[in-house]
Every structure is written in C-alpha cells, then in structure tokens.
Amino acid sequence: IMTAVETVIREGRPHGKLCIGFTPDEEIGEGADLFDIPGFGADFAYTVDGGDAGDIEYENFNAAAATVTIHGFSVHPGSAKDTMINASNVAMEFHGALPVMARPETTEGRQGFYHLCQMYGDVTTAKLGYILRDHDAAKLQFKKDNMQDIADYLNGKYGAGTVEVEIKDSYRNMLEKIKPHFHLIETARKAVRMAGLEPVEVPVRGGTDGATLSWNGLPCPNLGTGGFNFHGVCECTTAE
C-alpha cells in the first residue's frame, strides 16, 4: 500500500484526495470498531484484506459468537447413579444436537455453519466456544435460536440452569450498505481489467473490517491481494 502511494507521489500521477488507514486489530474482530471515520475524511473506501488477485468482495458473513456453559453435579462415581450430572457429557450431548452438515468442513458457497472453536471441562463445569456464520441474517438468527432451543431441552432433562448460552453479534453482511453505492464495484471492475485480470466476485466466507466500516457509514468493499490459504500453516502471498 505504501509503495503504491510512494509511486503516485514520485511519478506525479494525477489523483483526487486519497486517504490511507491501517487497522491493527482486524483478526480479533475489533479493528474498525473505534475507527475515526469523520477524521479519516473519505466518502468511500476499499479494504485490501486478503483474497485472490482480481477478487472484488462486497458480500460477507453475518457473524456471532456463542459461549455455552454447562453446570454439572459431581458426586463420588461409586454412588453416582441417578445423581451425578457430568458437565462434560452434557457438553458432548449439546454439540451432538447441532447438525453435522452445518460445520465449516461440510459447507461451502453460501452455506452457513456452527464452528466449535474450543471446548474444555470436567464433571463440574464445561464450556464450549462457537462462532456462527451465515450470509443470510434470518438463517443466522435460526442458528442462534436453535442453540437456545437445545439448551432449553437439556435444561428440561437435567434441571433448570444446567446449560447457559450467551450469544454476541460480531459483524454483519456489508451487501445492504454497498448496494446504494454500486459505482464502487463498477470502478473496481474497471481497475482489475486495466491490470490485465478478470474480476472475480463471490461472497466472502469470512469477515472484513470493511463490513464494520460500511455499517458505520463508510461504504467499503474489499479487494483481493493475491494471497492464499489464509489462517492456515500454508498461508502465503505473492511477492510481485
């Protein structure tokens, strides 16, 4: 990004007002929460946040995070019949009630998912940490409701308060905020073709700071960088 800015200045290329910003906390989902949009001074923007060369991305997941806490009842295993509630077993029962075909490893395209990111527990207490994703806000709400329904069922089975579900929204699909400013996409298409590539437009199976910026009043689609295998051990990007 800075090399591009340097080139524009050094070569005296004609341009309008350009605003450049860097957000430090994108990977924890808080990179744009406190971004000073009025101070930034732009009417529109693009993020450069991963994706294949030629990618133009203006539709992303709606996202939420869920924490499931299970409270068990521990007694001596030798006299546990009809008394013990093993929190770890209830945690497995909760996870087993979620659809197997709605996991990251079984979905693609516009299919949303429940992703179990972490779990730990013992007889007394267990916790499950999930992220929930869907391009369709109504389908994401269904996933939230489904988790609460499972908790209600298990509380009916094991006793009130056994399972607690806490859900927090993370970010929303930017599409609704980009549609009224679709010249951003037309301009990006033209730029990609001028660079000798063909634009590729697919819904992002993830999120970007541009989504938060768009909802906060700065319409901001994403441009691909030519990188691959993000968030994996084989992550790489082009050097050109």
State what each model feature region is.
Residues 2-59, 103, 111-117, 121, ...:
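Acidic/histidine-rich catalytic neighborhood of metal-dependent amide-processing enzymes
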Residues 74-75, 132-140:
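A generic structural motif
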Residues 58, 80-119, 138-164:
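Acidic-enriched catalytic cores of C-N bond-cleaving enzymes acting on peptides and small amides
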